[in-house]
Amino acid sequence: MRFLLFFSILCYDFFYRLDFNLAEMNKIVGGFAICKELGFCPYNLKICKSGVFMPDPKYVPEEPICAVATALAPAALGIVRCTGKGCVSLLSKVFSRPAALLQAAGNSIVYGWIKNGGAKIDEVMVSVFRAPKSFTGEDMVEVSCHGGPGVVMAVQNVLLNNGFRQAERGEFTFRAFINGKADLTKAEAVQEIIESRTGESRSRAVGRLAGNLFEEISGIKKLLTDTLASIEVEIEYPEDEETIADSFDRSDLQEAIRRLSELNDSWQGEKLYQDGARVVLCGRTNAGKSSLFNAILKEDRAIVSDIEGTTRDWLESWVDFGGLPVRLFDTAGLRETEDVIEAHGVELTKNLTEDADVILYLCDGASGLSKDDVDFLRNAEKPVVFCWNKIDATDAALAEKNSLALKNENIEKIKKEIKISAKKGNGFSELYGAVKEILFSGTGNERAQAGLGSARQKLAVEEALESVSHSIVAADKDFALDAVVQDLEDAIDFLGEVTGEVTADDVLESIFSRFCVGK
């Protein structure tokens, strides 16, 4: 590896002096590129300011790129985003006021027209951002044009025909990463924000974008590096401790383990806020499932009728359960029927409950508990929130009798019993809380200040936690200090994978290929 690195640097120096194209140099040195004058080193290469494996051969640093950054749908405005070396100069060639654009300071806006030869394409406002004070760390421009898809594409086509290349997925954010404008936790948070379904999901991703996870990882790394430094001093200048366990203070390592454990435990809860949960509404016919479905959605999606068997197929929709994204299913009522279509719907209901994270089982409080209810609940495979519906039409004595009857059945899968009125909207807060309590049981701190944002991050934190734990075991067993040092160095490298200071090229490709074009 050192030979390859040395050879790559020689190639870079040789071809750079010849003003050789970086893309061609990429091919010659086997995909390894040294990026000139970058302040952040994703691979922690100390012999140059920045060295990165490009995750996609089409990702060429500094090459002028452009992409539509807004949805291709009728709108008041559309934006075409551009970045790269010379992008302002290139844009000036198709701009009606080239001198004003070339002289524009960073964080300024210039009015004019995009032109194709002598033809005016659209009246635009151009936002100018100068390196390094831009999202990518390069010179950037954003062309704000009228938002019709035809107009936006026409503006982009003019740019593509005048020196710009179509940006790849995530290429703008990738350039921000290699130019030190964002670590990997922030880059991944950008995509999380785009994909967030609720305000709480967005808030958690914004926290990572603001740097709370990076700061937590940096704090843990400092604990490890401080301990590592003290051990290395002991190796160089040994004293007379009887055992290795006595030769250094392990309090920082124990604190690192505590904080790594909290981070590791946070992922299951954070994953729920990203991916959402599957919640299935079921119960006997006319229990009020469709009414509850419509009430939660705040729209009439499901047909509501007093006629039994109205719902024969299932409906689904994403909803906000107190900040948690939930994929909610309304299903056919459970009953024995000779109607072939309805019977198929009942079978689909049972299949959906097998894949659910939580079952919301509705029972009409005025009708009470039936043998069919009990039989279904005893066979349930997933946790159940049992909902007595129509409490607005159920007197207190009957409600108490119903609750006692349910408790006497002692059904294992029922985790919560609540009372609601789908018609009046009563008990919805308790309903959301019950579902969340079940889902977050055993997931660590639901309100973690710095939670993990991806499975990749969790894997790296798990490895770091294992290495730190092993270092303490090694010290307790009186292994050589070099063994402890190796464990701590491994842990620091694993944490570097979280932030991107140590990351393989295939990992980068996996991360940035998930982004939309223009981000």
Positions of predicted regions on the chain:
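A glycine-rich (often HGG/GG-containing) alpha/beta subdomain
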Residues: 12, 42-203, 207, 211, ...
